[in-house]
Structure formats: structure tokens, C-alpha cells
Amino acid sequence: MRLRDLISEFDGFVIDQYGVLHDGVRAYAGAIAALEAIRAAGKRAVLLTNSGKSAAANEERLARLGIARELYAALVSSGEAARLGMEDGAFGPAFAPGGKVHVIGRTGEDYGLDRFPLQPVDLAVADALLILGSDAPRVSLDEYSERLKPSAARNLLALCANPDLLMLTKSGRQPAPGAIARIYETLGGKVAYVGKPHALIYAIASRAFAGVEPRRILAVGDSPLHDVEGAAKAGFTTALVKTGLSAGRDDDELRRAAPSAPDFALDGL
């Protein structure tokens, strides 16, 4: 079964980006056609991505891969959700305008820090941590642990704006920002999460489906723990696609990885 077989059954679609539409280098076969079919049916697709970057930066990347902006109604990134949460005061005074925050991410990556109302500083003088990306494999989890021990001892709050545990890279699967956040928790640090499977990003995505019952929205992703679990908690119908992080994994393994079983298992889009 593929996503295109289910378009007539639902009123809206929430679709993951990495591992579902593309692999970071090229769009998957059938991905563009599926978005075109949703649009032709007069229905809306919202792309929901655990990415510390802005929605605009993700849209630009998709365009470079041939996925045109007109093919989806909106894109919501976890980084964008974090910014909106800061504006609403959701994360407390440490992330209020002007807060001294140390940013964790990939070396040389542009996370558009000017969109956050914060003051980026060195780790030693930070009042909070903002985890936007991972520098793995250049920096190992053991090295992150050593770096973050003093921050945990100081009881600094960390905001993880990408809860993914694994990421697809040219060198294979590597620890993602969520894995760094877990390391910080094991050190005794406190972490707030924004992104799938947590509620805020789904609340933002739901704004594009005013008047649509949650069960009439099909959420499609490749991560049992993030895409399926988060969408199920939001009340959406769920579909796990066997690409990306789920490629090559048998059904029993996928079931063990998911607190909530998906409503549908898809071979592709």
C-alpha cells in the first residue's frame, strides 16, 4: 500500500520530510507525485519536520530537491515551533528576549539564530542551552557528555528543538540532537523538548486544518517513536512508511520500537 491509495479516505495530510519525501540528497520516487495527487484532490498537505532550522530554510532545501512550494500548504519545523514558544514565554525566563544561551549544533551550519530573541554565548557563561543540531560523528556522545557536565552541575535548562535520536547522513545513521538531550538528562540536566512527538508542533500544524476532525488527518512518517507516537497523541490517524529510518526493518522490530502501533503501514508514497 502507498499513500496515494489513501488520499480519497482523508481530508488532510501531515507528512514528515527527511526519510519520507527525500534522503537529504534527492527526492524519493513517488514523493512529488503523491504531493501533486493530494493537491489535485483539493486537499492540504502540511510538512512537519524535526529540524532546528527555520521553515523558510527547509522550504529552500526542498525546492533544490525539486519539491516545489506550491505542492504543500505549509511547513512547520521544530526550530520554528521553538521560536514561537519563546515568543509566548513557554520556556520560562531563561529563554526570554536577551537570554544568554549556548547553542549546540553542527559546525558551520546556519541555523538563522537572528530569528531567536536570544544572545548566543560561550558555554561557560551561558544561562541556558539551545540544542538545534548535532555535530556527530565529528563530536561523539561521550565528548558531548564531558562538555555538558558543568552545565548540568549548574542546573541549566536545555531546550532541544529537534528530539530525533538518529539522523541520516552521508556517513550513515548518526546521533541526532535528541540523543544529546538524553545524554544531558543522564547527567542530571533538565530538558524541554519541542518537535515530534511533543504536543506544541502538532498544535501549530493543526491550524492549517481548521474545522477538520483530527482522525480525518493522516500523519505519515518513518519514525515509530516520533512520527507515529506524536501523531497518535494528537488524535491523527497514523501511517508508518518503510523508508528512511524504517527502511530494512522487519514488522516485529518496528512494532517493538513504537509505543503506538500505526493505523497503516506503507511501502512508499
Predicted features and spans:
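N-terminal phosphate-binding loop and flanking beta/alpha elements of the actin-like ATPase fold
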Residues: 44
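Asp-based, Mg2+/Mn2+-dependent phosphohydrolase catalytic module
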Residues: 1-17, 22-41, 51-269
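Glycine-rich loop-to-alpha-helix module at the N-terminal edge of alpha/beta enzyme cores
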Residues: 48
